[in-house]
Design a protein with these regions (language model features):
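Conserved HGGG/HGGXW glycine-rich cap/lid loop of the alpha/beta-hydrolase fold
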Residues: 1-23
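Active-site signature of alpha/beta-hydrolase-fold catalytic machinery across serine-
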Residues: 2, 65-69
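Conserved alpha/beta-hydrolase catalytic His-Asp/Glu region
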Residues: 88-89, 108-166
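Catalytic His-Asp charge-relay segment
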Residues: 169-171
Length: 171
């Protein structure tokens, strides 16, 4: 969030908050639905190109699909730890989704597990209070509905891409 404030001093910034990640109470449905909604919103606001786009994790998956569809040109893109669809049999994809779903629930339920899997001394930014950071993170993880968690893990690993991605010249 600090980077958004800094960038907004010199650029017009659009920050996407996906369903299931904010305070709307709506569940996340899919990468495809999210990308369609973002594209529709940008077009409705007469945004016909983007100078830059950034996506991390699920955001990287959404940005990957957004770029592949090529409905709105993007000059530069950064995909950080972006998720691409699995290329394995359905049964293995279902087992991976179950593993991820159960792992998330365990981390969200137990502060001890959260801190064991993601040690605060490694994941807390310098100068920040790890107790406050992890209090906020633990509270935030509890806001996800079971449906949102399941849909995120299923969709992020199984979304569709066009057979031939759009040629946009994005760097």
């Amino acid at each position: 969030a600090d980077s958004v404030v800094l960038l907004a001093q010199d650029y017009h910034v659009v920050q996407i908050v996906y369903d299931g990640h904010g305070e709307t109470g709506e569940d996340f449905i899919s990468v495809e639905t999210t990308v369609d909604e973002v594209t529709d919103w940008l077009q409705a606001h007469s945004i016909t190109r983007l100078n830059a786009a950034y996506g991390c994790s699920l955001g990287g998956a959404c940005l990957t699909r957004f770029l592949a569809l090529g409905k709105i040109p993007v000059e530069r893109a950064v995909i950080d730890a972006g998720i691409t669809p699995y290329r394995m049999p359905l049964i293995l994809r279902r087992l991976a989704c179950l593993r991820d779903d159960l792992g998330f629930r365990l981390i969200a339920k137990s502060r001890k597990v959260l801190e064991t899997v993601y040690p605060p001394e490694r994941w807390t930014m310098p100068g920040r209070d790890p107790v406050k950071e992890y209090d906020a993170l633990a509270a935030y993880l509890k806001t996800y509905s079971k449906r949102t968690v399941r849909n995120i893990f299923w969709s992020a690993n199984n979304y569709t891409l066009p057979t031939k991605p759009a040629e946009t010249g994005c760097q």
